A protein has these predicted regions:
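Conserved short beta-strand edge segments in small beta-sheet-based binding/regulatory domains
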Residues: 113-125
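Extended Gly/Ser/Thr-rich low-complexity repeat segments
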Residues: 102-114
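Interdomain helical linkers/hinges and coiled-coil/dimerization scaffolds
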Residues: 1-104, 123-148, 152-168
Length: 168
């Protein structure tokens, strides 16, 4: 009975982990990895980044890695939470390569285009230091905030948005 209750609380524990990670509540990589392992997430990968994707009326849950084409992306661990106040979903992507981050963001973009006819998917730069998670989130949020002035035909990348902001 206890095992069943613990198992049923796993989604909430993962949600809590993602929010704590995003806010930079872990003083070291080791502490973050241990906390993630306690909720059965393997985040001990060289790169991570954050992706924001809008919530749709037809979809009030984040996409899962079992959905096509996300299920074809390898070498990544993806955790997601609803950011209710902002009306979007945050995906924290831990990856073996920087390309894995792009693959997840592009897959999310493709899903949104196919299901809703439009997509606004924004991503941070790739990071390695887990203590930089708050800055990583701000990068994704900055890219997302530029959705009104940028074309949403592809993923809005912070590196691209920040270069264009300097030109304004």
């Amino acid at each position: 009975d206890l095992a069943r209750r613990l198992e049923s609380s796993l989604p909430m524990q993962r949600h809590d982990f993602v929010l704590r990670f995003m806010k930079g509540r872990f003083d070291s990589r080791e502490l973050a990895v241990a906390a993630a392992m306690s909720v059965r997430l393997d985040i001990d990968k060289p790169y991570y980044g954050m992706v924001l994707c809008p919530e749709q009326e037809q979809n009030d849950q984040p996409f899962t890695m079992q959905e096509e084409p996300l299920n074809r992306v390898t070498g990544v661990t993806v955790c997601s939470v609803e950011m209710a106040a902002m009306n979007n979903f945050l995906y924290v992507v831990f990856a073996d390569t920087e390309q894995g981050l792009h693959d997840v963001a592009n897959a999310l973009h493709q899903i949104c285009i196919e299901r809703y006819g439009h997509a606004c998917v924004a991503m941070s730069n790739a990071h390695q230091n887990f203590t930089h998670a708050p800055a990583c989130y701000l990068e994704a949020a900055t890219a997302y905030d530029n959705r009104f002035v940028m074309d949403d035909s592809s993923v809005l990348e912070y590196s691209f948005v920040s270069v264009n902001l300097r030109d304004i």
